Swiss-Prot record:
Residues 36-43, 98-107, 166-227, 287-297, 353-364 are cytoplasmic. It comes from Arabidopsis thaliana. It comes from the Eukaryota. PANTHER family: PROTEIN PIN-LIKES 3, PTHR31651. This is Protein PIN-LIKES 3. Keywords: Auxin signaling pathway, Endoplasmic reticulum, Membrane, Transmembrane, Transmembrane helix, Transport. The chain crosses the membrane at residues 15-35, 44-61, 77-97, 108-128, 145-165, 228-248, 266-286, 298-318, 332-352, 365-385. Involved in cellular auxin homeostasis by regulating auxin metabolism. Regulates intracellular auxin accumulation at the endoplasmic reticulum and thus auxin availability for nuclear auxin signaling. GO terms for biological process: auxin-activated signaling pathway; endoplasmic reticulum to cytosol auxin transport; response to auxin.
Length: 390
């Protein structure tokens, strides 16, 4: 009982940090202060997206990744993908039960599928590692490897959000209405061909090729490569190259590396990511307070999916993978895998709704509720996870 209480105190400290920094962002967004208004949040969000997050992911991943560690972490991309797939299934159940308006289906599905694999673990892991007598051993090595796990998790989450969730929300937010075939097109389809069979065969081959070309062009227009290859994704790729190629690693990474100033500079810039992202969350919560129009049943459905059913699924998957020897016995690694199922929705969903122009205010309401209750969920579940893996 005493050990469980100690774990509860350990897991509650990072949540208090999140609440304090979030309250600063909330205060700065008030009309009377107006230091973090709509435009300021937009510009700060761009700085986080293009500068802070890539620097953070690149520096942490390059520092911790090696061939051996990458082999050990092979299950993490699979685990992150499973959080998205299971979340999507739970989101679809929420949609079926609560019957929201059609233009909000993509938002609800996205909130259940995409978790905040960025700044939440980035705050929780270092805070947990710093605690004396924690379940993860030496604080310095805990933070080094823990941040490497989080950086890979953040990179994979970014890829899945901008490939899977982005297109899922786009399809559900903009369902095209199929036009019925015209009389002329039906008439043309029944015309008797007046050309030879050989010419007809050639025309059919040409028609098939043209159809394939049209589909490829249509696919390239629908899939936005800029969103897939986001700055964080590119930074993760560069970090993997540096970490895995030994000569490059010795040149840049380490206390005796000739170009270690590059690593130190990128790390220094990346350290601004966590406070900036957390203050943006605080500013966005104020917007949620001023919004309305979201069905309470849909909000409750998202909360149950994200904070009850998804973490329970995570326990079954991660512990099952451990029993099957798919995951190593390292407690910190298992804790990060479990934590991926218990985080609130990704803040990038707000950016996606802005791109589509639908569900912006409703997204703010969902974020208000989910991040307000995250203080409870991110205390209770990590306590249980630490007890489970210790």
């Amino acid at each position: 009982m005493v050990k469980l209480l100690e774990l509860f105190i350990t897991s509650s400290k990072p949540v208090v940090e999140i609440l304090l920094i979030t309250s600063v962002g909330f205060y700065m967004a008030l009309d009377g202060v107006n230091l973090l208004g709509h435009d300021a949040r937009k510009y700060l969000n761009n700085i986080v997206f293009y500068v802070f997050s890539p620097s953070l992911i690149g520096s942490r991943l390059a520092d911790s990744v090696t061939y051996e560690s990458l082999v050990k972490m092979w299950f993490m991309p699979v685990n992150v993908l499973l959080t998205f797939i299971i979340g999507s299934l739970l989101g679809w159940i929420v949609i079926v039960i609560t019957k929201p308006p059609s233009h909000l289906r993509g938002l609800i599905l996205g909130c259940c599928a995409a978790g905040n694999l960025g700044n939440m673990p980035l705050i929780i892991i270092p805070a947990v590692c710093k605690e004396k007598g924690g379940p993860f051993g030496d604080p310095e090595s805990c933070q080094k490897y823990g941040m490497g796990y989080v950086a890979l998790s953040m990179a994979m989450g970014s890829i899945y959000i901008w490939t899977y969730v982005y297109n899922l929300m786009r399809v559900l937010s903009n369902s095209p209405v199929e036009t019925p075939p015209s009389v002329e097109s039906n008439y043309d389809s029944y015309k008797v061909p007046l050309i030879s069979s050989k010419e007809e065969e050639n025309n059919q081959k040409a028609g098939r090729w043209e159809k394939v070309k049209r589909r490829l062009v249509s696919l390239s227009q629908k899939v936005n490569l800029k969103t897939i290859f986001a700055p964080s994704t590119i930074a993760a790729m560069i970090a993997l190259v540096i970490g895995l190629i030994t000569p490059l690693r010795k040149l840049i990474i380490g206390t005796e590396a000739p170009l270690r100033v590059l690593q130190d500079s990128v790390t220094l810039v990346g350290d601004g990511a966590v406070p900036a992202m957390t203050m943006i969350i605080g500013g966005n919560l104020l917007k949620g307070l001023r919004s309305s129009g979201m069905k309470m049943s849909s909000i409750i459905g998202v909360l149950v999916a994200r904070y009850v059913l998804l973490p329970m699924s995570g326990v079954l998957i991660v512990r099952g993978a451990y029993k099957l020897d798919l995951v190593t016995s390292e407690p910190l690694y298992q804790f990060v895998l479990l934590l991926q199922y218990a985080v609130p929705p990704a803040m990038n969903l707000g950016t996606i709704t802005q791109l589509f122009g639908t569900g912006e205010s409703e997204c703010s309401v969902i974020m208000l509720w989910t991040y307000s209750l995250a203080s409870i969920a991110l205390t209770v579940w990590p306590t249980f996870f630490m007890w489970l893996v210790a």
